[in-house]
């Protein structure tokens, strides 16, 4: 059963234990300047603010339709339009990989460490320039760097914070152990440490329930799930095929691998009278550990459709049915391992 509550349910939540308030949906910008042109990207961002979505996520390497960094440049042009746009947004971006652009010499990381102090400082300065802003609200490590010492990494982020160039530090794609280590090492040095973790999390991939979610809860991190629709697998893909939608080879393989589950899932969504994408997002929003799933609309229409997930509450019986279709890992560690 699905209970429809109100017609506008974008809510603000704290980012973990921290005081900043962010919308319970995060606007992902990976498609901007690639699958979505600049005009439509601007319209999506304007509409997001109208709807109450104030949390925007990007990365320094986004822009695969042209050059890496193009998405940050696009956001910078949108901020430059004024009208309070920058002040209205809690802006998150990421650092880790070299950003390849034609006008730059190839970026050489002589020590091979992608979270070296040199790389973090250089990455922040370049992102600030592209984004046309003086600060990044949430600066995230895009991946773990197991070679660079935490002393160097944490001090680099702390220095940026002291300079007013970043406000909060986040992680992405970290294991529970990595989160715990980062938070412990930051605490030893009197640094604020991590404020959030961005992980892949959806009905068909619940691995982070073992250790990442417990680590986020213990250390007070906000959780920002990416790929909430499993790249489209949870977005009504089988119905789409019937309607003539063309699929990539990768998606065909995913369907073949998970067809039984997806058939049951789409049938359940039909009985509930909601789209599969709505149910997938609503399932994440029902988890108190989740701060804001990242949505990646390619059109304003898709953005508006995403809002429906915030307007419904899934009943306990529906949650149990979803668990039966997509069983989790068996609980949190070490409970999932021991008996």
Predicted regions and their residues:
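Short, acidic/polar
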Residues: 36-48, 115-130, 179-183
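Acidic (Asp/Glu)-rich catalytic clusters
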Residues: 79-86, 128-132, 161, 183-189
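Active-site mouth loops of central-metabolism enzymes
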Residues: 29-39, 105-118, 147-148
């Amino acid at each position: 059963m699905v209970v429809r509550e109100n017609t506008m349910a974008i809510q603000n939540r704290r980012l973990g234990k921290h005081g900043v308030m962010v919308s319970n949906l995060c606007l992902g910008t990976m498609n901007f300047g690639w699958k979505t042109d600049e005009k439509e990207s601007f319209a999506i961002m304007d509409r997001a603010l109208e709807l109450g979505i104030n949390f925007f996520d990007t990365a320094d390497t986004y822009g695969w339709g042209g050059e890496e960094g193009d998405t940050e440049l696009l956001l910078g042009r949108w901020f430059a339009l004024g009208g309070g746009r920058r002040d209205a947004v809690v802006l998150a971006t990421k650092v880790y990989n070299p950003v390849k652009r034609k006008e730059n010499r190839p970026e050489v990381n002589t020590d091979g460490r992608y979270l070296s102090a040199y790389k973090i400082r250089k990455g922040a300065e370049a992102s600030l320039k592209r984004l046309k802003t003086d600060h990044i609200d949430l600066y995230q490590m895009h991946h773990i760097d197991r070679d660079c010492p935490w002393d160097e990494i944490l001090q680099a982020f702390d220095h940026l914070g002291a300079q007013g160039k970043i406000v909060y530090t986040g992680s992405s794609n970290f294991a529970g152990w990595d989160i715990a280590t980062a938070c412990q090492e930051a605490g030893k040095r009197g640094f604020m440490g991590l404020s959030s973790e961005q992980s892949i999390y959806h009905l068909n991939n619940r691995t982070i329930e073992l250790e990442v979610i417990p680590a986020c809860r213990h250390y007070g991190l906000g959780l920002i799930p990416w790929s909430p629709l499993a790249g489209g697998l949870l977005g009504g893909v089988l119905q789409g095929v019937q309607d003539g939608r063309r699929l990539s080879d990768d998606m065909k393989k995913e369907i073949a691998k998970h067809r039984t589950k997806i058939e049951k899932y789409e049938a359940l969504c039909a009985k509930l009278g909601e789209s599969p994408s709505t149910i997938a997002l609503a399932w994440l929003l029902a988890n108190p550990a989740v701060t804001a799933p990242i949505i990646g609309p390619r059109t304003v229409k898709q953005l508006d459709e995403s809002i429906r997930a915030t307007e419904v509450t899934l009943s306990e019986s529906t949650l149990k049915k979803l668990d039966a279709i997509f069983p989790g890992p068996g609980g949190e560690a070490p409970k999932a391992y021991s008996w």
